[in-house]
Amino acid sequence: MDIVGGQNLRQMWDDLAGVYGDKTALIFESCEGIVRQFSYASLNEEINRTANLFYSLGIRKGDRVALHLDNCPEFIFCWFGLAKIGAIMVPINARLLGEESAWILQNSQVSLLVTSAQFYPMYREIRQDNSTPLNHICLIGEQLPADDGVSHFSQLQARQSATLCYTPVLSTDDTAEILFTSGTTSRPKGVVITHYNLRFAGYYSAWQIALRDDDVYMTVMPAFHIDCQCTAAMPAFSAGSTFVLLEKYSARAFWDQVRKYQATVTECIPMMIRTLMVQPAAPTDRQHHLREVMFYLNLSAQEKDAFTERFGVRLLTSYGMTETIVGIIGDRPGDKRRWPSIGRVGFSYEAEIRDDQNRPLPAGEIGEICIKGIPGKTIFKEYYMQPEATARALEPEGWLHTGDSGYQDEDGYFYFVDRRCNMIKRGGENVSCVELENIISAHPKIQDIVVVGIKDAIRDEAIKAFIVLNEGETLSEAEFFSFCENNMAKFKVPSFMEIRTDLPRNCSGKIIKKNLK
């Protein structure tokens, strides 16, 4: 089923500008509260000027350009400006440091970078090291350093025409983006995303939340992440909705921003839900227009119930990853939700639970979640320059091995158990980290929790819990272990616990377990 119809991203924006014109397309709010707003017509002009900017710097179809930016309108300009001339965006996680960023530049062979003043010192050092092909930096900000190979984005963009000066032939099969995975356990892999992938994501995710042109979709997710791009921005623009992009997440400001922009849809991760719940209760908690909150794993039933009751919202569960582009399993519009199920497989996909010999399993049995899609269309095309990694993850028939454990019930609802690499082997027993984290998170003194496996000479692995307490609370080891013993099987009780002020996280809120031992 082809729902894109050969329409690439250049055509999409030209059509949107013509159809929606002066309707508000994008609202951006900075951490300082400065608001910038663009209609569909004016946003398309900004995108065209940015495309011409890249052309003036020598960028042509197939060239790769890196973006290292926090949320800002310029990210949107660059993303679609590159797509309009057939060039390829390589977004870099804004939290990455020098060595990690240089590795991505080297592996994607990027010569041009767009970044902001706060990240410039790091990239100046990278250029001086001559370890990457990077030879030019386009800088967003008021002050421009007097360095060779540096240009000012705003000044250069303002000089460009709002009409495209370079229009190569584009196909929906062309690569639009190389998005590097978060790499919480190893080096990231470059996920190749096509024009078709992004167009499909817009239609699919709009269907998933029944998005209309009178909706306002607000997100705090980072623009360099698949969630912001393919479950927020693309559906919002594809449906002619208003997309509200906030620079950073603030638990204190979140609900005021929801009300200020009259948001009807937003997306949340567990970290957001937990930090919102520790804010003081207010009479305005349920005074908003939200009809759906897109939710990504993982949350205990107690946390879910407390959040939905306090704020009067529905959580729409969506399961996916960078490689699936969208939430390929999830709740459907109008369906009764079956918590803790992650929902049913969406249109254009198939899903199975398979054993270690790659054989389908019956309902109720735990195995690997496998998804069938069309590479380069409904799932990613490949890992950039990594054919062996692509072959391990993606079968020739289009079956993608997610690396996640789960099961399905007799009615076709799927249930997530854990990342297969997130299982702890303890004395012959497989212990799910997610299961333990959900149990421990119910302790009233605990704000955040993660468990990891550490080497144990006798039992393969021991279990260690890292804990963040609610403000002003104290928790003794005796109290912690007693709680665990009363709420889980003996072999699942952690052997060690450590209290921390925070936990290391990547851009999507996932805890970076390789930094904890």
From Swiss-Prot:
Kindly give the NCBIfam families that the UniProt entry links to this protein.
PRK08008.1 (NF005947)
Task: State the taxonomy lineage.
Answer: Bacteria, Pseudomonadati, Pseudomonadota, Gammaproteobacteria, Enterobacterales
The superkingdom of the source organism is: Bacteria
In which pathway does this enzyme or protein participate?
Answer: Amine and polyamine metabolism; carnitine metabolism
Q: Name one GO molecular function term.
A: crotonobetaine-CoA ligase activity
The catalytic activity of this protein is classed by the Enzyme Commission as 6.2.1.48
Q: Enumerate the Gene Ontology biological process terms.
A: carnitine metabolic process; fatty acid metabolic process
The Swiss-Prot or TrEMBL record describes its family as follows: Belongs to the ATP-dependent AMP-binding enzyme family.
| Protein name as catalogued | Crotonobetaine/carnitine--CoA ligase
